[in-house]
A protein has these predicted regions:
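Long, internal scaffold/assembly segments composed of regular secondary structure
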Residues: 120-134, 138, 175, 188
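Residues that define the transmembrane beta-barrel architecture of outer-membrane proteins
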Residues: 48-52, 59, 111-117, 177-183, ...
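Residues on the lipid-exposed face of transmembrane beta-strands in outer-membrane beta-barrel proteins
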Residues: 1, 54-58, 119-123, 185-189, ...
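Outer-membrane beta-barrel channels and translocator barrels
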Residues: 4-6, 49, 60-63, 126-128, ...
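Solvent-exposed loop segments that connect transmembrane elements
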Residues: 24-40, 77-107, 143-173, 209-238
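Transmembrane beta-barrel strands of outer-membrane/channel proteins
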Residues: 11-17, 58, 67-71, 133-139, ...
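Extended N-terminal export/anchoring regions of large proteins
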Residues: 1-12, 108, 112, 126, ...
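Post-signal-peptide, soluble extracytosolic/periplasmic N-terminal scaffold domains
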Residues: 1-60, 69-71
Length: 245
């Protein structure tokens, strides 16, 4: 806390560090080979979240002003875990009788960052009249390295590149960016006895600034074979998404 004895200019510097380790609840899935077992195993947990913050304000007789900035960092130290398939000794391309992956790899939450800056005011007038406003802008980013399409070493892309190789990917990392803007205004007053007036306005905008990645194929059918994917107007990335961009 800065200036703890000065109520006119209060300021606070904060730091939050949260480390979680151990295991989450049981998780897992199917390993698609000639035998399709389903596994439930404890999901490893090892993540670190840090938040750096700064808040300051200016108080005066007719109201106050305030501003803040926060920087949040999330680091997942257990990004993947692998399950062996006891019914499949080696990797192979799936056929009607044999084949499939000898292992399954599960990808957990990637590292990501967020920055938020905000400022606001509150003004006081006669007849219990109050006027306030807040503005907050944020930037969310995620640029963790991609993992290969599959862990199955036997699958090839149409160009002959091994699908478990990083060179088969359209790019090496996501380079994701999202901008947010929040605007909030409030007004209240009691101009005469028995009459109260209140009004408010709130606006929120989220803009995805991530560049489009075209994916023309994958091994989404559980690591068994390469599948060609054709982008369409509804699935511009080659996969169904929550929104049409």
């Amino acid at each position: 806390r800065i200036n703890p004895e000065n109520p006119t200019f209060p300021a606070v510097v904060s730091y939050l560090r949260e480390h979680k380790s151990g295991y989450r609840t049981l998780t897992g899935g199917n390993v698609r080979a000639q035998v399709n077992p389903s596994y439930e195993v404890p999901e490893p947990l090892n993540e670190l979240t840090q938040d750096f913050g700064l808040r300051a304000a200016y108080n005066f007789g007719a109201g106050h002003l305030h501003a803040a900035f926060n920087r949040n960092l999330y680091n997942n130290r257990a990004e993947t875990f692998v399950i062996d398939d006891p019914f499949q000794a080696f990797d192979s391309v799936n056929t009607s009788t044999v084949g499939g992956p000898s292992r399954a790899r599960f990808i957990n939450t990637p590292d990501n960052e967020a920055s938020t800056a905000s400022a606001g005011f509150l003004l006081k007038f006669a007849r219990q009249t109050r006027l306030g406003g807040d503005l907050a802008v944020g930037r969310w980013t995620q640029d963790a390295a991609f993992y290969p399409y599959t862990i199955n070493t036997a699958i090839l892309t149409p160009t002959g590149v091994r699908a478990d190789s990083l060179s088969a990917l359209p790019q090496k990392s996501f380079d994701g960016k999202i901008n947010t803007t929040m605007l909030n205004f409030t007004f209240s007053s009691r101009p005469v006895k028995g009459l109260a007036l209140r009004a408010g306005f709130r606006s929120y905008d989220l803009t995805n600034k991530t560049k489009r990645i075209i994916i023309t194929g994958d091994t989404a059918v559980s690591d068994r074979a390469w599948t060609v994917v054709t982008p369409t107007a509804d699935n511009p990335y080659g996969h169904a998404t929550a929104n049409v961009y």
